[in-house]
A protein has these predicted regions:
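Active-site substrate-binding loop specific to GH73 endo-beta-N-acetylglucosaminidase modules
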Residues: 115
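Charged, low-complexity surface patches
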Residues: 14, 109-110
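Extracellular loop and loop/strand-boundary signature of outer-membrane beta-barrel proteins
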Residues: 8-11, 65-69, 103-106, 147-153, ...
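Outer membrane beta-barrel
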Residues: 1-102, 121-125, 205-229
Length: 229
């Protein structure tokens, strides 16, 4: 069974346009079937993750993608590079970075706005658990659309986030037993001074899904969660 690892958006502008949304190149490292490397001028962190972290289908609500696009995850289309290991026993690991590389800032310098994610994961046919460390530099705020206004106003600070994810699904689809995806994020900000500034924020997500209930490829889902606050 394929796991959804993307989200489609509709363009509603009035002018004709042709643009490249994502582009990258992935190659094995040496002759290895377990190690790979990715580089691209337009890529997001999660395309380079070691494993899919959620089986809840986001539908119309992108905030529920990847078990909640909150502290550690979020839209991040920039220049990126990463490495990934996927073992035969279910263990997988990845480390990748995307950088805005704005003019004069350089790559991974103190002035550069970048996001570096490292994941450890264990996945079997029916379940998955993972932990991701996200190091965000120079006011990176890809979490902003799933957070309270107070969290978004993080005063040009660096941040460190952790994302725990897990899912489980029954052996057979189309039954009354739902598949379940859960997520919990915590993010802490460096340098936020003053009593009205957020030092730490958390979020959570729970999604239940019933695939193939009436016919193949249909889906019934219920998802709820708390934005970063």
């Amino acid at each position: 069974e394929k796991t959804a690892f993307y989200h489609t958006d509709a363009y509603s502008g009035t002018a004709d346009a042709l643009a490249v949304d994502k582009i990258w190149y992935t190659t094995p490292i040496g002759n290895s079937e377990k190690w790979s490397a990715t580089v691209g001028p337009k890529i997001e962190n999660y395309y380079m993750y070691a494993a899919p972290v959620s089986i809840y289908r986001p539908g119309f609500h992108k905030a529920f993608k990847l078990g909640s696009l909150s502290g550690a995850y979020g839209a991040s289309t920039k220049t990126g590079v990463g490495v990934k290991y996927v073992g035969d026993n279910g263990f997988a690991a990845s480390s990748n970075v995307v950088s805005s590389s704005s003019t004069g800032a350089g790559f991974l310098t103190n002035e550069d706005e970048y996001k570096w994610d490292t994941m450890l994961a264990y996945t079997k046919d029916q379940y998955h658990v993972s932990l991701t460390l996200s190091q965000q530099h120079e006011d990176w705020n890809s979490f902003s659309y799933y957070a309270t206004d107070a969290v978004v106003a993080d005063e040009d600070s660096n941040a460190t986030a952790y994302a725990a994810r897990a899912y489980w699904r029954p052996q057979e689809s189309g039954t009354a037993t739902p598949e379940i995806s859960v997520g919990y994020d915590v993010i802490s900000f460096d340098g936020n001074s003053g009593s009205n500034k957020v030092k730490e924020a958390t979020s959570y997500f729970v999604g239940l899904g019933w695939p193939d209930m009436f016919q193949d490829s249909d889906y019934i889902g219920i998802g709820f969660g708390q934005p970063l606050k």
